[in-house]
Every structure is written in C-alpha cells, then in structure tokens.
C-alpha cells in the first residue's frame, strides 16, 4: 500500500493544513473523517503534525490537492501562491486593458454623427464586434456574417492574393471587369412623374 507520508525536508513549497482548517473552507467535507476520506481517495500528501502527543494527528499539503479543492482552501486561508499571484496579475492586466478599450470606444462613439451611430449599432447588432472591428478579428468570419458562403470567401481570398493582371484576366473570362475608379453618372437622374 502506498503511503502519502513524506519527509520534512521536502516541504519547501508546501502549505500544510490540519483537517479542521480544511473542513472550514467552502466546498470541503464538514467533518474531520470526511476530510481524511477525501484525502485518501484523492491521494493528498500528508505528514505527522509536530508537537502532538500520540503522533496520530496529521496535516495535509494543500498543494497536493486537485485544483478545485486547492483554490478553495487557499481562498479560505487568504493565501496567495505563485500561481494564483500570477493569475491575479494577469487578471489585473486584462481588466486594465478592457477598461482602456471601453474608454476609447466610448470616446469614439461620442464623436459619431447620429447617422454613423445608427450604422455602427446596426453592424454591432448583426455581426457583433467582429463586424464593427474586422481588423481585430478574423476576416473570414466577417465575410460569413455578411452572408458569403465559405467557398465564396475562399475564392475571394484567392483572387485577392493574385497579381492584378492575373486577377483581371480571370475575371474577364466571366464577363467581370474591375473598375479603376469611382463611377459617376454622366447626368443627374430625371424626376419621374407618377401617373394618377
């Protein structure tokens, strides 16, 4: 039978807790026997507790627990491990970045004309942030939101990657001619009178 007891000199990165401390954490068993049972089932590392007469008291290494239990006990103890400290820093960096993005977007939205704001809202509601900020997200996903099939998107990407002359040659075979500049009507549209 495998023993979970370890030597004292291997405990540098360990956090040792009594079963009573462990059972006080959220989501942990409500009795000492329950803590011992879970520790045996999950294979937590244990050691004899120092200074206890009779030598039957044990304490468990929190770092040997599965992630869920470990996080619950560490939170209960109010401790921070190197892992949780790094995660906290990463969350803080992410939170600061999101706050900065939010502020920037709000400032930009405040500068929009009412018509531009309506268009942006329509794009946002139809395609999400991807439609509003296509350069941030995958270009192929943007085209699929607009309604292009995957095959059309791939064809478009392939044609776009070709040299201009080759692209014109291929498109001309299908009667499609690229326009060099903006097309402007040669005359103003005539008003149409409705027949009564």
UniProtKB/Swiss-Prot annotation:
**Where is this chain's protein located in or outside the cell?**
Host cytoplasm
The subunit structure is: Homodimer. Three homodimers assemble as a homohexamer.
**Expression triggers:** Expressed in the early phase of the viral replicative cycle. When present at high concentration, negatively regulates its own expression by binding to O3 (PcM promoter). PcM promoter, and thus Repc expression, is blocked by Ner. The host SsrA, the ClpXP host protease that degrades Repressor c protein, the Lon protease, and the stationary phase-specific sigma factor RpoS are all influencing Mu repression in response to either temperature or stationary growth phase.
Q: What processes in GO biological process is this protein linked to?
A: latency-replication decision; viral latency
Domain of life of the source: Viruses
Query: What organism does the record attribute this protein to?
Result: Escherichia phage Mu
What GO CC annotations are associated with the protein?
host cell cytoplasm; transcription repressor complex
Q: Which UniProt keywords apply?
A: DNA-binding, Early protein, Host cytoplasm, Host-virus interaction, Latency-replication decision, Repressor, Transcription, Transcription regulation, Viral latency, Viral latency initiation and maintenance
Outline the segment boundaries, as ranges, of region: Recognition by host ClpX-ClpP: 192-196
InterPro entries noted in UniProt: DNA-bd_dom_put_sf (IPR009061), Mu-type_HTH (IPR003314), WH-like_DNA-bd_sf (IPR036388)
This one is known as: Repressor protein c
Q: What is known of its domains?
A: The winged HTH N-terminal domain cooperatively binds to three operators O1, O2, and O3 with respectively 3, 4 and 2 binding sites. The C-terminal domain (CTD) regulates DNA binding by the N-terminal domain and degradation by ClpX-ClpP protease.
Q: Which GO terms describe its molecular function?
A: DNA binding
Where would I find the HTH Mu-type domain in this sequence? Answer: 13-81
Q: How is it modified after translation?
A: C-terminally truncated forms act as exceptionally stable repressors that prevent prophage induction.
Q: Which Pfam families match?
A: HTH_Tnp_Mu_1
User: Where is the major localization of this protein?
Assistant: host cell
